[in-house]
Structure formats: structure tokens, C-alpha cells
Amino acid sequence: MRILIIAIAAFFFSNQLFAQGCCSGGSGSPIAGGTSQGVLAERQVEIGMSLQSINTDKFMIGDKPTKDYLKNYNSNYLYSRFAYGVTKNFTMSVEAGYFFNKTQTGLGGEKVFDKGISDLIIFPRYDVYTHNTEKTRDEITLGLGLKIPLGKYLDSTVSSVNPFTGAKNYVKMPPVVMPTTGANDFIFYGFAFRGYPEKKFRIFANAIYIRKGWNALGERFGDYASVGLFAGKTFFKNLGITLQLKGEWIDKMDYDKQIGKDGMLAIYNVDVTSFGSKKIAIVPQISYPYKSFSVYILSEFPLYQYVNGTAIASQYLFTLGISYRFFTVKQKG
């Protein structure tokens, strides 16, 4: 049986959940739920769901904290995945998510809020190397995915009301509260695993690169790269403890030069100087399998952050998930 490890890389993308920006930057969903994964066994099915919650009142200029930006940002995201082992080496998954809320609270208590479906993710993975002995299990998996936006990326909110006529003036909501960026993105993924079954110990790593596309507004949010190093051990038969060291990088935003000349960036509520960041974090996780089910919980703790301009910083990230695996045909033996 091929290896499928439920070890959330807290965000494939915590960046995808709130990203960067003055009046906020990128938006979208955590690609593939952040799961560090190999492939399923042939004709094995996995159905997974997780709830990811972000809350922060931490904002930064470069690597220094600031209190003159926003009061709070929070989001709650439901991620779902259906994966199928087409062959012993090839797994196909279809993934999607829904934001219950993406809320930005200003210094005066004013709130900007949105919700809705985010993206559809088609994510095939192929096991390019497997070698098992009595003492070790090795696996290398590569993946190439596509993110297709389904949700809103252009929405507005009331900015003021004329006291005499009652007429309402609207402004575009900042990208950070939009459920998606409105662009097609390509996902490049690598996963390497070594396990020591007798010792119930495992080490593994993943690398992710997301090449962001252009949306209809002439915006291209910054590319994303992440590397995760994991170590895990099983205690008391089924209790899995995993610790991840994660580094991530988000590039600056690009935009069509014509919308810059026309002053549309201000109308779009975007400050391109406040996009992009670097972060190092540790992510502890606890998982517990029971029969065909697995339950897991994790949280992310940033060790170092740097943002371009003035931007939202990572503070609290929490994930609770469950997965169910079964075979479409009865296994021999």
C-alpha cells in the first residue's frame, strides 16, 4: 500500500487565507488543504474535510509590529477533498473550499466582510519512486495541479450614504476578504518520505510552488513557494505526533500598467507596495486513526516574519480535520 500521510502543512497556505496588502492583498483558498501527501493505493478512495480558522490582530511594517493599520482580521474556511487511487502509482484528487467568513475590522471598529465558495482544485500526483525493506519505507511523489476560481473576486461595500437623498456610494472590497483571486493558478508539488516502521518514526519533506495567473481586473497576485520539513512518531499504537518546520515566500503583486495609469488600483482598493512576505514557522500536529477514519488537529506558530510595506501578519492558525478511506473493491489476502 502506498503512503498517504495526513500532515497538514498549515496552509499549504496560510498565505492563501489572508495574504498581504495595504487594505489587504491576496486572497483565495489553501491549495489542497495544505496536506503533505503521497499517493493512495490502487482503487482506494479518500474523502476528507477540514476547518481552518485564522485570527490575527498583528500587523507589521517590514519585520516590525505596527498598531496603526487594522484592528483585526479573521477567516473560517471549510476545505473538502475527494481523492482516488487510479493505479498503484497515480492518484487523482478534486478539491474545493468555502469561506464562512473573511472579515477585516478597522481601527474604528468598522467591518468589511464577505463569504462564499472559493476555488476548484484539480490535483493529480504520481509516485516516481518507491522502495520498501524490512526496516525502511521510501517514497517520492510529484504533482501538478490547477486551481480554477469559482467564487467572487469583485464585490463592493457601502462606503457612505448621502444624508439628504439616501443615495449610497460603493467601493470595491479589499482582496483580502474576497473568496478567490479570480485567476487560474498552476501548482507544482514534490513530496519525499522515509519511514522506519519498527521504530514507528518517519521523516518527510514537501515543496510547493504556485504560479499565479492574471485575473480579469489586470491583477496577478504574487507567486507562492513553500518548503516543509517534518518528523513524526507514533505513540500508544495510534497516537501520531508530527512537528513541521516550514518556510514560505510570497512574491510581489504584478498588474497591468494601463490600470496603473488610469488610477484603477486605488479604485480596486489595492496598494501594490504592500504585497509579498517571508515567513518561518513551526507547526505541531496530533493525529489519531480509528479503523478507516483519521482525525487530526494542528496549529501554526510563526518564528520570523517579514512583509513588504504595511500588511497583515500571521498570528493564530488552527486546523481541525477528518478523513475517511476505503477501497472500491475488496483487497486480496
Protein language model features and the residues they cover:
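Detector for outer-membrane/organellar transmembrane beta-barrel domains
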Residues: 42-55, 169-263
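Outer membrane beta-barrel transmembrane domains
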Residues: 58-60, 66-68, 218-333
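Residues that define the transmembrane beta-barrel architecture of outer-membrane proteins
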Residues: 41-43, 74-78, 114-120, 138, ...
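Outer-membrane pore/translocation modules
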Residues: 104, 110-206, 212-213, 269, ...
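Surface-exposed strand-loop-strand hairpins of Gram-negative outer-membrane beta-barrel proteins
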Residues: 52-77
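Transmembrane beta-strands of outer-membrane beta-barrel proteins
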Residues: 45-49, 92-94, 122, 138-144, ...
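Short loop/turn motifs that connect adjacent beta-strands in outer-membrane beta-barrel proteins
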Residues: 21-23, 36-44, 89, 130-139, ...
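Transmembrane beta-strands of outer-membrane beta-barrel pores
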Residues: 51-57, 96-102, 128, 146-152, ...
